[in-house]
Amino acid sequence: KGLCVQSDTLLPTIFLSMIPDSFSEREKTELRTTLTECFQSKTTERTEELLDNMVVELPFASELVHLTSFQQILSSLNGRDMYYSIEKIVEQYYQADESKAILYPEEMHEILLKKIHDFAINQTTAEKNGAAELLLTEPIKNLCLRYRNQVPITVVQGAKGSGKTFLYCRLLEKKNWNIFCSEINKKFDSEDNGYFLPVLATQNSEEIKPLLSQCIDEFNRAIDFADASVAVYIDNAYKLSLEKDNDIDWMKFWEQIFVSSVNKNMTSLSELDEALQINKKKIVLLIDGLEEILQSVPSSKTQQKAIAVLCQGVLNTISAKYENIGLIIFLRSDMAQNAITVNYEQFKQTFSYAELKWSSNEALKLAVWMVDHAVKGFYEESVSIENASQEVIGKYLEKIWGLKLGKSNSNEAYASNWILAALSDFNGQLQARDIIRFLEFASISNGKKPPYYDRILMPSEVRNALPNCSRKKISEIKAEYENLKPIFEKLENLSSSKKKLPMNAEDGIMTAMEEKLMIQAGYLIRDGEKMYLPEIIRHALGFRYEKGARPRVLSLLLKH
């Protein structure tokens, strides 16, 4: 005890094996903490990080409970996750140290950093963010497969920045459902039909306006009786803003919005559907930008009802009665959760096929995609990045930021795990712009000679990117989530003595409603009376860990 742990200190690897599923994450974290504390009595965040890889949990294997011979052990281990876990650890100590390889000489370092930095800056807005196309492949395929023979009637949920606006723009560009789907899958019907009409759209983007105008023009051209205003989405936003706090018949309101958007002389969905049937045409109504108008959903029963009626009552009615009318509602996940107060989980599951939620694997693929677009010829495989295996992606990630944040046989953190934990929230949400922004800041040169030539981004550059990412993240949250802004300002203004993790619930730092909103958004998690913040916001808020808190936060972040 009391050993001074450094990156090259020879530490044992402790295997936790045969841990039953009944063990909670909390119990496992306490066990790890007890073991690591044997090696250092006084820890800092930096030295705690060096102990992250010392305790390794091996998956439970019932066939290894009763063993009679060495031969049986070898036979039982063959092909097991336990075997591969041990193999990976042993390999890093006995293979040649790849960090000595020269893939990127010193004279290339600054050039590569600038290319990545410039490309990342160019990828920051949703409308021109080609990165979203890579990551939305699966939900788009799901949508097209589910509605290959009919117009779609669905809710596309996703957090802010998950790609909703990007997908909305893609639909506008193609102008009708059949053409959109035929470009995803050539086997689908490519005959024009399912014409899009933007009933509501985001008001915060100049780039989307030409797409909206062109889509409305095509809608009016294709549907004989259509007379949609070129500003229909602005007119509808105004109507909604007038009624948003009034206790009205929301079924009637939405029906009138929909039919009057097509033609002001129409009075009902049934009249619209009949006219479409006669003309042998189908339409798809598009709704986006609700969060810009309905800004008080967590506290306003009226606004909750407006969304609930739209996403349940209206959507179900159209689905059951009107085969020529489609509806795609783009909705921020937190708004859906606050508005659908009964059976939200069932609602979420119903539309899970179209949810825009990216996994950590997809986020890592995005990093490879970004570098490949910035540095031509970086990715050399025949299989596309979106279809590449984890093993292939892992090989290229090592070329970007190394296996570890140091030598491959050091005690430093595994780079990919460290980055995922640094950028994720407690809901497992990792947005495209988080990875893009990380690469933007990590590619800012520190002006020093690179210590390694086997990777593009140096450990110091990776670490230095996090505080900048954290500050940007909090600025975005305060700008985009009106209900979270005062909570973040309260946390920012706490005295330094109170800025420690875990926070104690009984200290009353947050009200019950504030706690609920933060947990819902993924920026707080409660474990008994203890409350934790994720890394992505902790840094900019200036919170520090108390002893043993950091491993608990990491286990919660990486369990997704």
Give names to the regions the model predicted:
Residues 2, 14-23, 50, 403-560:
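C-terminal leucine-rich, beta-strand-based interaction scaffolds used for sensing/assembly
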Residues 2-103:
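Long, basic/Gly/Ser/Thr-rich N-terminal segments
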Residues 18-24, 34, 38, 88-101, ...:
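The catalytic "switch" region of P-loop NTPases
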Residues 30, 34, 38, 50, ...:
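Charge-rich, solvent-exposed alpha-helical interaction surfaces
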Residues 58, 67-69, 76-186, 553-560:
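Walker A/P-loop-proximal flanking segment of P-loop NTPase domains
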Residues 131-154, 265-268, 307-312, 348, ...:
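Short linear interaction motifs
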Residues 132-134, 146-284, 289, 293-300:
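P-loop NTPase nucleotide-binding core
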Residues 142-147, 176-185, 273-276, 315-322, ...:
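Alpha-helix termini
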